Each structure stands twice: as structure tokens, then as C-alpha cells.
Amino acid sequence: MSGEMFGDEVDIKARLRAAEVMYKKFHRLISDVIKGRPPKLEIPKRTLSNTIFDPERGILVIGEEKLEREFLNVGESRRFMQTLLMASIIYQSLIENEYPTIRDLYYKGKHTIVYRDYSGRKREENTWDEQKESDSVIQDIEVYTGLFREDMLILSKEKGKVVGNMRIRSGGDVIDLSKLGHGAYAIEPTPDLIEFLDVDAEFVLVVEKDAVFQQLHRAGFWKKYKALLVTGSGQPDRATRRFVRRLHEELKLPVYIITDSDPYGWYIYSVYKVGSITLSYESERLATPKAKFLGVQMTDIFGYRGKKPYLSEAERKKFMIKATDKDIKRAKELLNYSWIGKNRRWNVEIRLFLKHLVKLEIEAIASKGLKFFAYQYIPEKIETGDWID
């Protein structure tokens, strides 16, 4: 290592482990060159066609298909170069005691290479043009090394929040999540480095929107019902998904999720539950297969087979929003996903949506009154088991 390492013991151990794994994985390329073999990388394909739903584990997993990136293959040489460049930057950050963000890595690696082609003409090539290109390279390194970017101490913007009767240790400090006033604890980008000390909660409630999270927080929902209240502020980041998984897996707390009643809200639930297609290689640690969809359900709005709707006809007219062509297309896509389309309850929900072609935001339920939302709608659905599994 270069220089004396700093940080708490947990960080130092993570740094040492990641640096060792990266060194061993990429040192193989040097061995190939020494032995006269063209260096190449074999990386699992991160595509929809190589994403499989494992019904036994209830999560999306990456398949066995791999792609080869060879240095001497003209079609693959640029991506090969990008992968080695990014790996070297990450490794250097590890041994230099740095905590780069994904944006930092983009800028550190972005430059123009000037060279001459076979005919002697001068050429210029950027290492990468946009951040989404460098982000994709980081994901390739994750699947190649088996390390996640959090393991490599790569930071990202904090997005998720949590509040509740729980104490944790982070960076050597003990934090009481019940004593943050009207604020909440921002879930750090390296949630595996958080130590759970003690908790007094009976379940986890994840709400899609930050505004709804704040309403429930100020209403004292988590105090009254002994809950840990979490939000991913829309599409959840990896840290929030991992934190929720840990709460369920390590503390054995049931997880309930509330999103808008539309195809995009349903997909957010799916991401928490089974994982995402783009990050299927991370589902084992990010997904929470037993997470339950509490609402807002289409059957909450229209009723179904004896279930009474929570909204009157007048309230439906007031709060319902007409579905867009994009919403309709997304709903049909969801039905094609086996983990949704083969689920009887989800078939009912989505076909009700396609029948009425309307959607509802969480705030519409809350508009009946915060007390109704916090003290009747949510607890009633939990008590009666009115969720989709």
C-alpha cells in the first residue's frame, strides 16, 4: 500500500480486501502476455437475454453467457482498454486511501488518446465520452471481479432515508435514528459498513416518495406502530435496497412497500423485491424476495370481489389521472415479466389498470386526510393481510 492507511477499522479491512481481489484478477492478464497468449477478459453478459428469474430464490440472477474482450480484437479493443483504465484508477484509489465518487472516476479517466492508424494518419479517440459509458465499465468490473462498487469504497450520492427506534454504528459513531428531529438518517453509499446495534421495531415500511415519507414521519407513524420508516426517493439506489435487505435478513423484520398505483410504481416495488435487470448480478444482496406490496393497489381504488374501495366515486373522479401511452406500454411490458405476469394478484392489478386506463398517486390516498392514511389505511391493510406477495 502507498502511504499509511487511515479510516476506521471496517474501512481499512474493506480497502485491503478489495485491493487484493483486484490485483489477483487483473494480474492474470500479465501472465497471459508473458506466456505469449493474447490478453482477454471474460465477463458475464449484463443483458435482458442473460437475465433469469430464479423462482426458488425469488430473485433475478445473471445467466451463464459470457462475452470475451480481447486486446487484439479491433471490435473489442476500445472496451478492453476502458476496462483496464477504470480498473487501474479504482485500484490506485484503494491503495492511495481515496474515496472516489462515480463522477470522480469518470473525470479521472476521461482524456483524448492521439495515435496514428496503419496508413499513418493521425487519429484521436476519447477514452469515454459520457458518464453512462464509464458507469457501464464499472459494472463490468463488478461482474468480472465479484466485487461491488461499495466494496471498492466507490461513493455515490445519498438518496435513501430512514427513521425509527434503532441505533447504528457508522464510521465509529453511534447514531440514534429516533433522535433526528424532523430530519432522518441519510443511508450512506456503503451500507454494509453500518453496524446494527439495537432496534425496537416490528416491521419496515418503505414509501416511494420523500414527501410522503416526511408526512408519515411528522405524523409520528413510526412511533405509534413501532416501524422503521424508509424511502428511496423514487427509484431506489443500491444503498437503500441493500439497507432494506439487511433489515429483513439480519433483523427478521417484515418489509411492506407503498408506491404510486401506476406501472412505474409497480416496477419500483419489483426492483426492491426481485432485483433489476441491469443489476441482476447484485440481486443476491440487494433484493428482498419476501417484501410485500401494500399499495396503492388498483383494488384499493375500484374494489374487487367483495373488497370495498377506499375511494368513493366522487373521490375517484377527483384524484384519478388518465394513463399515458407510455404508461400503457409499460404495463404490458410488466405482464411479460414472468415474475409479474404469472402472479395471479398482479394480473388482476395490471388488467384493472388496462381496463380503466387511469392511475393514482400515493398523495391521493393521503388527501383523504393524513390521519386516515397513517392511522387507518396502512395499519388496516397490514392487519388484514391486504397485500400482494
From Swiss-Prot:
Reactions the enzyme catalyzes: ATP-dependent breakage, passage and rejoining of double-stranded DNA
Molecular-function GO term, any one: magnesium ion binding
Positions annotated to bind Mg(2+): E208, D260
Entry-linked CDD domains: TOPRIM_TopoIIB_SPO
Cofactors named for this entry: Mg(2+)
Domain Topo IIA-type catalytic positions: 13-161
Pfam families per UniProt: TOP6A-Spo11_Toprim (PF21180), Topo_VI_alpha (PF20768), TP6A_N (PF04406)
Protein EC: 5.6.2.2
Single Gene Ontology BP annotation: DNA topological change
Annotated active site: Y107 (o-(5'-phospho-dna)-tyrosine intermediate)
Cellular component annotations (GO), alphabetically ordered: chromosome
Main enzyme class: isomerase
InterPro entries, A to Z: Spo11/TopoVI_A (IPR002815), Spo11/TopoVI_A_N (IPR013049), Spo11/TopoVI_A_sf (IPR036078), Topo_VI_alpha (IPR049333), TopoVI_A (IPR004085), TOPRIM_Topo6A/Spo11 (IPR034136), WH-like_DNA-bd_sf (IPR036388)
Alphabetized Gene3D superfamilies for the sequence: 3.40.1360.10, Winged helix-like DNA-binding domain superfamily/Winged helix DNA-binding domain
Keywords, sorted A to Z: ATP-binding, DNA-binding, Isomerase, Magnesium, Metal-binding, Nucleotide-binding, Topoisomerase
Subunit structure: Homodimer. Heterotetramer of two Top6A and two Top6B chains.
Stated family: Belongs to the TOP6A family.
Known function: Relaxes both positive and negative superturns and exhibits a strong decatenase activity.
UniProt-recorded name of the protein: Type 2 DNA topoisomerase 6 subunit A
